[in-house]
Amino acid sequence: SRRQRQMCIRDRYRKQLFVDKSQEGRQAVIYFEGANQEVRFYLNGQFVGEHKGGYTRFCFDITSHLRYGQENLFTIYVNNVYNPNIPPLSADFTFFGGIYRDVYLQFMNPVHIATNDYASSGVYIRTPEVNNSAASVEITTLLTNNTLQPAEIRVENVICDADGKEVKKTHAEIKLASGETKTDISKKIKIDSPRLWDIDDPYRYMVYTRILDKKKGTLLDEVVNPLGLRWFKFDSEKGFFLNGKGRKLIGTARHQDYFQKGNALRDELHVQDVLLLKEMGGNFLRVSHYPQDPVIMEMCDKLGIVTSVEIPVVIAVTETEEFLQNSVEMAKEMVRQDFNRPSVMIWGYMNEIFLRRPYTEGKQLEDYYRFTEKVARALEATIREEDPSRYTMMAYHN
């Protein structure tokens, strides 16, 4: 729309940051929780990387670009000028630009839980079997050795209850070659008489995934993820069931902007929205039409709000392979970044996709329909492959 185009800008951000020499030899990764919509990142005048899409997290490994014991110049170019190959193309919300979510720099041991998997935690928790009497848990961990030597490590997964008391613990011993990234899949972990995650009792365990040096026993890395044990299904005639009980879903959709603030919000405002939903009797949030700040998902987990999360393929598509590929990449980012959220039960990938068709009749319209179907099938297949445990969604009216 004309209003949306008026908000399109090109920004440059610059920051000087002193990096202590004590960090030399460690892995350095910079994370962006959201910047709209095309980013080009430079460090000390050297190009590091780029990212397309304004609503998912991304990160860059900057280890080889840092200067230790001195100042470093971080330069980030961000523009949200209309690009027909990057969704969303058009919608009923404003496409604010710039860096509008948190940015942080993380240092870690060069032998660590992988950071290069679509800015995910590097740990994926699956619950293939859950019922009132028992639950099974599988934990997949991506491991990276960025040293010049092979590494012998011990991988531990510790499941703790909400009070921090250990419930279950598993371990495995792994050898990593220099420069290798390897996947460790835990054996099924059984939890007897689990306390379930539910709308009225959103109980969460926590999973501590640790890497230790096998010989010395020293901690190399640790990642913490939530674990909510629940099972659910949708029935076309009977509705939604959570943990075997029929539940009526009552809720809203939510956009991330506020009057006179745009979408660069403090955490308190995100928290306030979810609290208001809970206080008015809601139990469902459509996180629309794009992945939102991590604090939104954290609050939905904590308060027992069932969620659907979606990528911003809204109203229209562009008939190019680049548009299709960018959409697929967004879907992978979305699923991997929120994979461990117990509140997420639906992944969405299209909204009112034929609302503004570029053609009215004839072969052009038929070709447009066919390409839109191609995008839909690609996104459906991608999400099903990434996470077969949840439902998928396309939203329409009329």
Give the positions of each predicted feature.
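Accessory beta-strand-rich segments of carbohydrate-active enzymes
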Residues: 1, 6, 10-116, 120-122, ...
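Short glycine/proline/serine/threonine-rich loop/turn segments at secondary-structure transition edges
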Residues: 23-26, 66-71, 150, 190-206
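Beta-strand-rich binding/interaction modules
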Residues: 41-43, 134-175, 183-185
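Conserved, mostly hydrophobic/aromatic
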Residues: 45, 103, 205, 244, ...
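N-terminal carbohydrate-binding accessory modules
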Residues: 123, 207-277, 298
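Short, solvent-exposed loop/linker segments at the N-terminal edge
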Residues: 127-135
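Substrate-binding/catalytic cleft of secreted carbohydrate-active enzymes
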Residues: 274-276, 284-398
